[in-house]
A protein has these predicted regions:
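Rossmann-fold scaffold of SDR-type NAD(P)-dependent oxidoreductases
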Residues: 8, 80-89, 134, 184
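Rossmann-fold cofactor-recognition segment
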Residues: 46-64
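Amphipathic alpha-helical dimer-interface segment in Rossmann-like NAD(P)H-dependent oxidoreductases
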Residues: 109-129
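C-terminal helical subdomain
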Residues: 163-228
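Catalytic Tyr-X3-Lys loop
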Residues: 89, 96-115, 158
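Conserved glycine-rich Rossmann-like NAD(P)H-binding loop of the short-chain dehydrogenase/reductase
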Residues: 26-41
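Conserved glycine-rich cofactor-binding loop
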Residues: 11-12
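Catalytic loop of short-chain dehydrogenase/reductase
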Residues: 131-170, 177
Length: 228
């Protein structure tokens, strides 16, 4: 049976490296983000490598759109074996002034969108004993220095979303274990080269993170690991 990975929040860094890593292992790849043009170019680049890849533009902060997305991917590429969640939303940088809409936007993508995708893909994941793989970040950790960094970087909203997402990985993993569905997270401790967070001093190669995701997928343990 053909295996398909749903790559949510595709961009030039980790998610593209994950698409290449899994595609090289025979997976069909569904690329998801909001920019149709960028997605089409990325899918074309993967196809040039001999990987079956298609672009699926969607708003991952809209639950109805996420549910419809999963159905489109299933109809086009077959049952979903892996959900890779790399999507995030900025905004709500200063929680003393952020609007409720800004706070919701971050959580809608980072938490609610992920839960919705898992719910929609659940029959496929159960049938194939699949996996949910989440890109985490160091801002999720409870630490005075990290909290101070989140404030100074204007990333308070992202920090609380990543913290909620980190807990989500744990509880989803506990809930889905009886269905033999693996849930894992790679927490990235630093900036990844070639991404929006690269200010010229990034030290982490996206391919290294992708390789760790592949290791998690094959070993199905541990629940959380770190790169950086």
């Amino acid at each position: 049976m053909t295996k398909t990975i749903l790559v949510c929040g595709h961009g030039p860094g980790i998610s593209d490296a994950v698409a290449r890593q899994f595609g090289a292992q025979g997976f069909s790849v569904a690329l998801v983000a909001r920019s149709a043009d960028k997605l089409a170019a990325a899918a074309e680049a993967l196809c040039a490598l001999g990987i079956t890849a298609k672009a699926f533009p969607a708003d991952l902060g809209d639950p109805a759109a996420v549910t419809e997305l999963v159905a489109r991917v299933r109809d086009s590429l077959g049952p979903i074996t892996v959900v890779h969640w790399n999507a995030y939303a900025g905004g709500a940088g200063d929680l003393t002034t952020a609007s409720p809409a800004e706070l919701r936007a971050s959580l809608d993508v980072g938490v609610i969108g992920l839960v919705t995708a898992v719910q929609a893909a659940l029959p496929d994941l159960q049938a194939q004993q699949g996996a949910v793989l989440v890109t985490g970040g160091g801002l999720s950790f409870y630490d005075d220095k990290i909290d101070a960094l989140a404030v100074s970087w204007g990333a308070m909203g992202l920090a609380i979303t990543k913290a909620a997402q980190h807990k989500l990985v744990g509880v989803l993993g506990a809930r889905l274990a009886k269905d033999n569905i693996y849930v894992g997270e790679v927490v990235v401790l630093g900036s990844v080269k070639g991404t929006a967070f690269d200010a010229g001093n990034a030290t982490i190669e996206a391919s290294r993170v992708a390789a760790r995701f592949w290791e998690l997928y094959e070993a199905r343990t541990p629940r959380v690991t770190q790169v950086g």
